[in-house]
Each structure stands twice: as structure tokens, then as C-alpha cells.
């Protein structure tokens, strides 16, 4: 299925039903009093997260959503039927913005919890409501009020504990395939990953975390170059970021310069991302079979980046060092979630 993480739609809640103008008409009662009933409230529009969805593609084809209008009141003091509410299902992690004002209306991160987005119109009042000691035959009614109408911008941000960062072909997709059940596409050319992929990493029968494979960044991604600009936003919900670096790139590029390019893009896009825990993952150590040469390369990268946080040397394709990485990630995620509780 095609991955779509942005959509523009219009929602319109139902109009309230009008109040009824009616008088009691029965045999032998020529001047019956008012008996016009109230209208029904208009239906409201709710958004609710569903774990079964992972893309906003449905909103590319259906862009207008309207709840049911309330029924008008009737004689005999009968109240009109309330308009049926409309519940729109979206993927977990969807953010709902007012497209006209930019206001964040809802951050839908919990499945099964409906969130009100557009309030239905209030019902109109029938003429029975206006009967008084000085006005026994009121002809006054009120119409139902219109429901809220909004232009919405939907933005999906994947919910993951760990985000993988790196230039194209750094080996992110290979890593996520090695440690999870994800079937991310892997090939020897840039931009194999065209949308964020999620993999569940299970370190024990009762412990697991979610890893997100973010499409490869290139220099200028924060300004929209390559694929990174659209997907940097998905990093905002992660607990920890992994900088995945190809320790021995075939094109002869400098791994230190590659890592600095990624850091620069993060800084330009959102400096707050740099406050997250960030670990360095040096991938493809299998390309340097000589232990001394490999260790010298690792130390030169750490020194060149002035890296102070954790460093892991792995071979994703051979699953070397990946288990230690996953256990360390699980421990960090558990500690962070306990501190937030």
C-alpha cells in the first residue's frame, strides 16, 4: 500500500433541526395551545485512531466529510431526531491541524479514544417553548444552528521508540531487517527506502520496542532536497536516535563528513532533536576484516566527530553486534519510560 503522511480534507458537522410551529387541533377543541416540538441536535464529527491503519491514503480520494443534520421538530410536542455522529478513523500518530489558522486541534496517539473535531449545531426551539401567561398562542420558533465547518490538514507522524538516521545506503534497512520482522526493501542503490518503515524488535517474550527506518537524508534535506524533508518530522516522537554510518563506503566518501551532514540537517530542521539521546552506530565492519585497521577507522571517526555518547560497531548483514545494540536500546527505553511515569 502506498504510504501517504499528509492530507487536506474538509469536515462539516450536521445542522441542528428547526423548531416546529404547530398548534393542537382536536375535535371540540378549536383553540388548542401550541405543541410544536424542538429540533434535534446536528451530528458531530470525531476522529479516532485505529491500529489497523498506517497511511492517510484514503483521504486522498475522499476529501469531504459531513455528519447528519438534526431532524426538525414536529407537532404533538415531538422532538426531532438527533443527527448521527460521524467517526473518522485515522492511523495512530495522526495530528489534526486547522488548515486556515494552523492551530493543532488534536494529537491522536491512543487507539479507541474518540476526539471531537467539529461540534454539531444546536437544535432549534418549537413554539411550545414560548408559551407564557401573556402569550397563549406563540408563533415564534428558532431555527437550528449550523454545525462547525473546518478545513483540516492531517499529518501522520509514526510512533516509534528508535529512529534510524543516515545517508542513503548506510545500511539502515538492512539493520531493521536484521533485528525485527520488518521486510524493508534492501538494494545497492540510494533511496531504496521511500517511506518510513516500522519494525518491532523483540528482545524477550515480554519486552519489545519499535524501530523506524527513516528514508536516507542528503545534504540540503532540511530545505527539501532528496526525500528527507518530508520525513524528518517522524523523528519527533522517538525516544532515541541512531546515527547509522557506513564505516567503509564504496564511493570513498568520508564517514565523518557524512555524519556531520546529518547533524547539520537536524540542526536546521529542528534543533530540539539534538536534545534526544543519540548513539553512533558504525555499520559494515565486515568490510574491514583486519582488526587493527578496523579499530583505527573506528577511533578516527569517533575523534573526528568528537563523539561523547555511546558507540556501537556492527555488521547488520551478518548480525554482528546487533544483539548488544538492541539490549542496550531496550534498557534505555525502559529507563526513559519509568522516569516519565
UniProtKB/Swiss-Prot annotation:
It comes from the Bacteria. Residues 129-144 have a biased composition (Polar residues). CDD domains: Obg. Keywords: Cytoplasm, GTP-binding, Hydrolase, Magnesium, Metal-binding, Nucleotide-binding. Residues 160-334 form the OBG-type G domain. Pfam families: GTP1_OBG (PF01018), MMR_HSR1 (PF01926). PROSITE patterns: G_OBG, GTP1_OBG, OBG. InterPro entries: G_OBG, GTP-bd, GTP-bd_Obg/CgtA, GTP1-OBG_CS, GTP1_OBG_dom, GTP1_OBG_dom_sf, OBG_GTPase, P-loop_NTPase. An essential GTPase which binds GTP, GDP and possibly (p)ppGpp with moderate affinity, with high nucleotide exchange rates and a fairly low GTP hydrolysis rate. Plays a role in control of the cell cycle, stress response, ribosome biogenesis and in those bacteria that undergo differentiation, in morphogenesis control. This is GTPase Obg. It comes from Legionella pneumophila (strain Lens). The gene is obg.
Amino acid at each position: 500500500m502506498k504510504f501517504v503522511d499528509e492530507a487536506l480534507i474538509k469536515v462539516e458537522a450536521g445542522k441542528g433541526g428547526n423548531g416546529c410551529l404547530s398548534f393542537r387541533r382536536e375535535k371540540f377543541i378549536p383553540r388548542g395551545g401550541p405543541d410544536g416540538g424542538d429540533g434535534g441536535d446536528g451530528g458531530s464529527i470525531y476522529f479516532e485512531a485505529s491500529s489497523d491503519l498506517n497511511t492517510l491514503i484514503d483521504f486522498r480520494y475522499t476529501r469531504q466529510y459531513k455528519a447528519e443534520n438534526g431532524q426538525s421538530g414536529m407537532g404533538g410536542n415531538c422532538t426531532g431526531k438527533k443527527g448521527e455522529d460521524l467517526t473518522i478513523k485515522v492511523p495512530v500518530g495522526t495530528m489534526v491541524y486547522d488548515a486556515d489558522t494552523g492551530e493543532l486541534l488534536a494529537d491522536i496517539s491512543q487507539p479507541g479514544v474518540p476526539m471531537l473535531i467539529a461540534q454539531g449545531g444546536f437544535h432549534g426551539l418549537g413554539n411550545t417553548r414560548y408559551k407564557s401567561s401573556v402569550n397563549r398562542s406563540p408563533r415564534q420558533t428558532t431555527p437550528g444552528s449550523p454545525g462547525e465547518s473546518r478545513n483540516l490538514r492531517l499529518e501522520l507522524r509514526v510512533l516509534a521508540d528508535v529512529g534510524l538516521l543516515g545517508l542513503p545506503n548506510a545500511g539502515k534497512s538492512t539493520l531493521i531487517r536484521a533485528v525485527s520482522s520488518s521486510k524493508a526493501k534492501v538494494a545497492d542503490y540510494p533511496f531504496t527506502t521511500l517511506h518510513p518503515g516500522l519494525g518491532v524488535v523483540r528482545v524477550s517474550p515480554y519486552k519489545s520496542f519499535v524501530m523506524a527506518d527513516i528514508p536516507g537524508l542528503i545534504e540540503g534535506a532540511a530545505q527539501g532536497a532528496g526525500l528527507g524533508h518530508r520525513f524528518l518530522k517522524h523523528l519527533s516522537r522517538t525516544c532515541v536516535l541512531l546515527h547509522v554510518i557506513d564505516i567503509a563506503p564504496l564511493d570513498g566518501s568520508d564517514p565523518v563528513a557524512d555524519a556531520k551532514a546529518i547533524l547539520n540537517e537536524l540542526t536546521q530542521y529542528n534543533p530540539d532533536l539534538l536534545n534526544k539521546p543519540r548513539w553512533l552506530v558504525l555499520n559494515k565492519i565486515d568490510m574491514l576484516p583486519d582488526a587493527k585497521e578496523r579499530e583505527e577507522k573506528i577511533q578516527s571517526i569517533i575523534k573526528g566527530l568528537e563523539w561523547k555518547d555511546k558507540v556501537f560497531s556492527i555488521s547488520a548483514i551478518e548480525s554482528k553486534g546487533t544483539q548488544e545494540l538492541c539490549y542496550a536500546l531496550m534498557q534505555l527505553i525502559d529507563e526513559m519510560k519509568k522516569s516519565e511515569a
